Amino acid sequence: ICSSACLGGEIPQLIMSGDIEGAERRAGMYSDIMGKGNFFLEVQSNSIPEQALVNKTLVEMSKKLDLPLIATNDSHYMKQSDAEWHDILLCVQTGSLVSDERRYRFQGNDYYFRSPEEMWAIFGNDLPESLINTQRIADRCSVKLKMGHYYLPEFPLPEGETLTTHLRRMAAEGLRRRLKTENPPQNYLERLEYE
């Protein structure tokens, strides 16, 4: 299951840059990769002016490309009243002062975990299918885990390698591939070793 994400996602970014055809190609590509019914166009409601344009375009793309919509909320804190605390934490994280008008901040106070009733009030009249699809995803993702038990993935290692040697080898190969050289500069090797 995959979605087109918030305004920071690739498809919304293409829409905001005016490249609707590029956004449609990307959406089609993700749908092909994930399989029919597993890729969703994601509409949201927030204080960012560009969101309305992106939502309108995503609804049109949904019809044109036969891709399902979901309604989500970009949640960064639990309650709407936590917006001020979130803003303060952003200041701590970025080393900014709350009084600095030019600092990084979220627009509005609607990045909280909205209730189902709030989501229905926002999307229920115009895009009820987006909420139904969101619930379908939740139903598909439902999992029950036994408390007190660790669930770790199985990760088979090549013969003769430990986790440490395997990770080191894969990281070194990735560095060489990314830099397109068999002999990365010493400062890169030192940073890789540090990491």
Regions found by a protein language model. Name each.
Residues 1-195:
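Phosphodiester-processing cores and adjacent nucleic acid-binding clamps
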